[in-house]
Amino acid sequence: MKRLALIGSTGSIGKQVLQVIREIPDAFVIETLAAYGRNRESLISQIREFSPRVVAVRDETTYKELRKLFPHIEILSGEEGLIAVATAASVDMTIVASSGIDALPAVMASIQERKTIALANKESLVAAGELVTTLAKKNHVQILPIDSEHNALFQCLEGRDPSTIKKLILTASGGPLRNKSKEELQKVTLQEVLKHPIWDMGPKITVDSSTLVNKGLEIIEAFWLFGLQAVEIEAVIHPQSLIHGMVEFCDGTILSVMNPPSMLFPIQHVLTFPDRYPSIISGLNFLTNQTLEFLPIDDERFPSIRLAKDVLREGGSMGCFFNGANEALVQRFLSGEIAWYQIVSKLQTLMDKYVVRSCLSLEDILQVDSEARALASEC
């Protein structure tokens, strides 16, 4: 039985993690929970259902309320609480289901304590890929990707000779705006952006999907996650979202992972790895899914992939700057300060002006992130 820490339990991924655990109850126990969002009622329900030993929250009001409701459970708050949840001695696997760089200290602390990492937090690798992967190698810690694309690549690469790998291919649905012209993209509304054709996600990642910055972040994540520096990483539009990732080998063979577009598939794979359990939902029926389309990404309309590859070429602190600036710009769009098309145009302008430096510590990363957000909030 695996003993789990779950960071981000009330978010979209966190709730689906718990859905898998409900269906395979004999395989897992929730030791600790952390929820830093505002979904207080959902967290209370989760505590009652799963009886974790330790719970961490962000705000003081929720902290005080939970202490009254659950006097027998250790309730913590702040960054220290998050780290305590992630590194509890009884935990085997830390599941990082939250988005944003706030989870990075807990990720680093978990690796230091040699916990297996189930990672749905792409920002940790985009902002601090070298630090995270170096520490993981040093401590012999395995990072298992929950993102559907990286999970697909992980399955295709398992047991393969790195010297035989030619290319990694990430697929993208194209987001809610994929069929709009460049002129139409100048006028899109928040309502249009948040109406994703395939995935039900939070607002930030849905905006990232619409700009294809999300796919750019995933290219950077794949670079660090798989450590295949000499291998080309590409992204293609695949509107059906049935193939989630592909690996091309030197002999021309391409392996892929196919399943219906549900995060329950990669979540179950990671939680049960290296074993395989019967799927908790129906798989792919080839007789009813007969069309597979693949389209190139139009750089004129969606330059985010090019920007992500610029990040990899620049190295150093650019990944952290790219991530922090994008997060701030997305928040400005969500609050109505800037138009949708300005997210990437301002991001490119900021990147062009930024002077890359080395990032040797967690403190360096957090400093660059803070600077990026400040600049993106003012431009």
Swiss-Prot record:
1-deoxy-D-xylulose 5-phosphate binds at K122, S148, E149, S173, H196, S209, N214, K215, E218. Pathway: Isoprenoid biosynthesis; isopentenyl diphosphate biosynthesis via DXP pathway; isopentenyl diphosphate from 1-deoxy-D-xylulose 5-phosphate: step 1/6. It catalyses: 2-C-methyl-D-erythritol 4-phosphate + NADP(+) = 1-deoxy-D-xylulose 5-phosphate + NADPH + H(+). This is 1-deoxy-D-xylulose 5-phosphate reductoisomerase. GO terms for molecular function: 1-deoxy-D-xylulose-5-phosphate reductoisomerase activity; manganese ion binding; NADPH binding. Catalyzes the NADPH-dependent rearrangement and reduction of 1-deoxy-D-xylulose-5-phosphate (DXP) to 2-C-methyl-D-erythritol 4-phosphate (MEP). Its EC number is 1.1.1.267. NADPH binds at T10, G11, S12, I13, R38, N39, N121, E123, G202. GO terms for biological process: isopentenyl diphosphate biosynthetic process, methylerythritol 4-phosphate pathway involved in terpenoid biosynthetic process. The keyword Metal-binding applies. HAMAP family: DXP_reductoisom. SUPFAM superfamilies: 1-deoxy-D-xylulose-5-phosphate reductoisomerase, C-terminal domain, Glyceraldehyde-3-phosphate dehydrogenase-like, C-terminal domain, NAD(P)-binding Rossmann-fold domains.
